[in-house]
């Protein structure tokens, strides 16, 4: 995707460099082709990850420390492999059918490599923005920052890690305007 942006949307690359220059963000690493090599071929997976890591370092001057697999696919075997490549953390899906009674709002660890921290996506809060935000048939439409923040604020106090993941393409102009007050509004009293 980075090469496509360089060719077809260099202004986006410029914006990513500006974001990088703030020192307030970290870019993730994922398989270069965004494929499913983690499920089929360990050597291919390693090559894909190394290729993407090198591209990120070449573009932004830093090696990513956190990994995001294609479609947030995770298993302890994949986690162990990711940890063996030096990553400190991994993003994955907080799927209710896997978590059961557990909450995605904690930092978990890989069973095979306990040093690898797992950050789980809150699928409902993420999808409320990425999938339902502009759906006028949705019961919560229109969604404003204060309502969204109230949902987060209503979570148990001990659940301090709220991971909202979405594709960059989900952020249209209306969504960007919606999020602008969020950092200030997110401060808990």
What is each PLM-predicted segment?
Residues 35-58, 115, 120-156, 176-177:
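Alpha-helical scaffold elements lining the catalytic groove of polysaccharide deacetylases
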Residues 8-28, 156:
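Acidic (Asp/Glu)-rich catalytic clusters
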Residues 159-177:
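A conserved active-site cap/scaffold subdomain adjacent to cofactor or substrate pockets
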Residues 30, 67, 119:
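Conserved, mostly hydrophobic/aromatic
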Residues 1-7:
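N-terminal accessory alpha/beta regions
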Residues 178-189:
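Single conserved hydrophobic/aromatic residue that forms the stacking wall/gate
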Residues 50-105, 171-180:
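Catalytic domains of cell-wall/extracellular-matrix polysaccharide-remodeling enzymes
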Residues 27-29, 89-91, 162:
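Hydrophobic faces of well-ordered beta-strands that scaffold small-molecule active sites
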């Amino acid at each position: 995707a980075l090469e496509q942006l360089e060719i077809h949307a260099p202004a986006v690359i410029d914006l990513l460099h500006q974001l990088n220059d703030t020192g307030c963000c970290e870019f993730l690493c994922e398989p270069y082709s965004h494929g499913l090599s983690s499920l089929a071929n360990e050597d291919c997976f390693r090559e894909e990850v190394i290729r993407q890591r090198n591209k990120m370092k070449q573009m932004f001057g830093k090696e990513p420390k956190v990994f995001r697999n294609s479609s947030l696919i995770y298993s302890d075997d994949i986690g162990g492999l990711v940890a063996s490549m030096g990553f400190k953390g991994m993003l994955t899906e907080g799927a209710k059918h896997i978590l059961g009674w557990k909450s995605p709002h904690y930092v978990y660890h890989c069973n095979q490599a306990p040093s690898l921290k797992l950050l789980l996506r809150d699928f409902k809060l993420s999808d409320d923005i990425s999938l339902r935000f502009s759906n006028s048939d949705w019961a919560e439409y229109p969604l404003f920052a204060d309502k969204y923040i109230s949902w987060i604020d209503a979570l148990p106090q001990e659940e301090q890690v709220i991971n909202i993941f979405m594709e960059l393409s989900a952020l249209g102009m209306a969504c960007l305007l919606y999020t602008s007050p969020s950092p200030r509004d997110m401060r808990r009293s």
